[in-house]
């Protein structure tokens, strides 16, 4: 039996690219359709497809990602899960998925959204049911100290329901979720790296959030037919309390977010400065913006009471619209112009530049942060003087990563490529030196890349070792599994002058952004402490059934291979709280618990405590059993729940 997949015209390289490019270009403006494939100063496209690589190169690539049994990866990767609503933990360079962290949606494996503790974090309705059961995670970032990751926290957004989740990186669990007020389509997210005023605070204390969809404010059914009154918000969340500190009312729709290393500036690239509600209205202007936020001034305005609130929210909202921020010396927000409908804004590791990718323009725009601050200080009469380069990169530039050696790597969606370009050379070219060859290399990817990131790319410690590329289409790269294809995450070695493709990885849709950092930056704990849980049962002797009328508390412990109660009895109609503590202290000795017909299943890790509520409404015998293998007598690890009629 042949293992070769049949190739049809629809799945050949040229047919595929022609189809996707034609379809995409049909929806873009005439300006993009007229762009050339290669900038005038760009070298020829690198032939980096799998068929072009010699056997020796393929062998080297395979060796670079292959780990021997028991060998550990050198990097962690935190990946968004898309409309799975979770965060994924990968090891690199192997690309192996190690863990999934449930955040915004229920997870049957661990009981997220089933236990009382997880439901409290997720948020519930008055009847105790989950407020939301869907989520769409796009962007994940981690906390900083001294310009590098410090291993405390990571954050991830939910675009559907405008929520932000915090991940504790000691246990790799979600511990807090906040719903942002006055916001729809919460998209871009980035923590600050320092305080804008106090240099001693050289670590993350704020997380900034951009809203993509503009809405009437308050969104109460009025002004729905007046798009000119719609606005978006830029939100600041406290990194520790997870409370919303303040919001800024702005023009335009936010895409991504970036922060400066000195803490003075945050930014969001924007499309639809026109304020249109329909597709064609959002692309009529030739240039959109990258909005810069002066954090110190915003917080001074809030402190001085120069804000308003909307609807039921008590969050202070300052005015960051263009009309109210014309005077540089008092402005809270500055709008640097960039080509229409930009996609992505990324901070260079040297702290000097933010780079916006053009999307509908074939360009990358380099903005020098010191010149933005000059405008705020009244030292520059023209804000766009901060643009130090705007150069052609290719068709459909979306996101940018860095190697710490002065090079940027930008995904080209329509070209199905990554372009490597030198930032300082691009600045020289923009200044008039047409001999400055800023494009260093191009590599084909498979296919239609979106997000991109490199090892340590968004820190001062960018090391230029590995580059990951999130491709939105996999097409013929993997065994067919029906109509729904996996996405394709591709890994490159970027330690040399040329990008070298190392591996393809099929992933369940649809991941978006991700970060990659050295494994020594986090110190995960393998066993919980009883003190982490107020309801912890510290001794099996505390087990039992405790009744207060119809309200019943069942205290249960597990220690392989047995539960502390052989059976327990309830009465029909009892309102039950079952508390389970895992008394095992050994790493990797996780227990599960399931109650047939009662829709209960969750796990407890070593020394973890969790609880569930249910009504004992079905008389009979119900064998509670352990779902997570922990002992040779795993099948025998059970207890009887007897509900008397």
Descriptions of predicted regions:
Residues 565-568, 599-603, 613:
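Beta-strand-rich interaction surfaces with strong enrichment in secreted/lumenal proteins
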Residues 176-177, 579-609, 632-639:
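Histidine- and aromatic-enriched segments that form or immediately flank copper-ligand environments
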Residues 39, 43-544, 613:
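Predominantly soluble domains enriched in secretory-pathway, periplasmic, or organellar proteins
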Residues 83, 94, 160, 169-171, ...:
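A mature extracytoplasmic/lumenal domain signature
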Residues 1-18, 22-32:
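N-terminal secretory signal peptides
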Residues 604-645:
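Extracellular/periplasmic metallocenter environments
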Residues 546-572:
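N-terminal edge beta-strand
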């Amino acid at each position: 039996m042949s293992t070769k997949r049949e190739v049809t015209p629809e799945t050949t390289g040229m047919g595929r690219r022609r189809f996707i490019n034609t379809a995409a270009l049909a929806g873009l403006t005439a300006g993009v359709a007229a762009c050339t494939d290669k900038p005038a100063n760009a070298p020829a496209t690198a032939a980096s497809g799998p068929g072009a690589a010699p056997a020796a190169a393929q062998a080297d690539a395979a060796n670079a990602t292959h780990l021997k049994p028991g060998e550990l990866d050198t990097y962690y990767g935190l990946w968004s899960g898309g409309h799975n609503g979770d965060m994924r933990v990968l090891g690199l360079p192997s690309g192996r998925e190690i863990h999934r962290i449930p955040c915004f949606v229920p997870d049957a494996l661990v009981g997220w959204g089933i236990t009382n503790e997880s439901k409290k974090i997720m948020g519930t309705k008055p009847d105790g049911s989950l407020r939301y059961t869907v989520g769409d995670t796009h962007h994940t970032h981690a906390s900083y100290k001294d310009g590098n990751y410090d291993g405390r926290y990571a954050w991830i957004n939910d675009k559907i329901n405008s929520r932000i989740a915090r991940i504790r990186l000691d246990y790799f669990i979600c511990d807090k979720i906040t719903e942002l007020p006055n916001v729809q389509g919460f998209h871009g997210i980035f923590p600050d790296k320092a305080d804008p005023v106090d240099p001693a605070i050289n670590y993350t204390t704020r997380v900034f959030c951009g809203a993509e969809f503009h809405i009437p404010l308050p969104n109460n059914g009025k002004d729905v037919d007046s798009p000119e009154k719609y606005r978006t918000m830029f939100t600041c969340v406290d990194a520790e309390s997870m409370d919303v500190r303040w919001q800024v009312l702005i023009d335009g729709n936010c895409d991504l977010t970036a922060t400066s290393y000195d803490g003075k500036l945050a930014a969001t690239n924007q499309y639809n400065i026109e304020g249109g509600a329909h597709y064609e209205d959002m692309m009529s202007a030739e240039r959109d913006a990258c909005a810069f936020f002066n954090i110190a001034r915003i917080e001074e305005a809030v402190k001085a009471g120069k804000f308003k609130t909307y609807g039921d929210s008590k969050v202070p909202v300052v005015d960051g619209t263009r009309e109210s921020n014309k005077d540089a010396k008092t402005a809270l927000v500055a709008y640097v112009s960039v080509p229409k409908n930009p996609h992505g804004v990324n901070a260079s590791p040297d702290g000097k530049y933010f780079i916006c990718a053009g999307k509908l323009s074939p360009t990358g725009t380099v903005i020098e942060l010191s010149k933005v601050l000059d405008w705020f200080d009244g030292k520059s009469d023209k804000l766009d003087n901060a643009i130090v380069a705007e150069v052609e990169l290719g068709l459909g530039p979306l996101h940018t990563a860095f190697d710490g050696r002065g090079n940027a790597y930008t995904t080209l969606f329509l070209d199905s490529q990554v372009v490597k370009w030198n930032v300082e050379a691009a600045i020289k070219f923009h200044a008039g030196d047409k001999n400055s060859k800023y494009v260093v290399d191009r590599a084909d990817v498979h296919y239609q890349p979106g997000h991109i990131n490199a090892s340590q790319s968004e820190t001062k410690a960018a090391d230029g070792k590995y580059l990951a590329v999130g491709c939105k289409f996999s097409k013929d790269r993997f065994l067919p599994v029906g109509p729904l294809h996996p996405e394709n995450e591709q890994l490159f070695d970027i330690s040399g002058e040329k990008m070298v493709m190392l591996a393809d990885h099929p992933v369940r849709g649809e991941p978006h952004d991700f970060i990659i950092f050295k494994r020594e930056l986090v110190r995960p704990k393998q066993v919980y402490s009883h003190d982490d849980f107020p309801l912890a049962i510290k001794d099996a002797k505390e087990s039992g059934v405790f009744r207060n009328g119809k309200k019943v508390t069942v205290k249960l412990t597990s220690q392989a291979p047995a539960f502390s109660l052989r059976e327990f009895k309830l009465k029909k109609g009892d309102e039950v709280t079952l508390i389970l503590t895992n008394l095992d202290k050994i790493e990797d000795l996780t227990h599960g618990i399931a109650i047939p017909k009662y829709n209960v299943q969750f796990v407890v890790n070593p020394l973890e405590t969790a609880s569930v509520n249910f009504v004992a409404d079905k008389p009979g015998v119900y064998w509670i059993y352990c779902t997570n293998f922990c002992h040779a007598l795993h099948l025998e690890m059970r207890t009887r729940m007897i509900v008397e009629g």
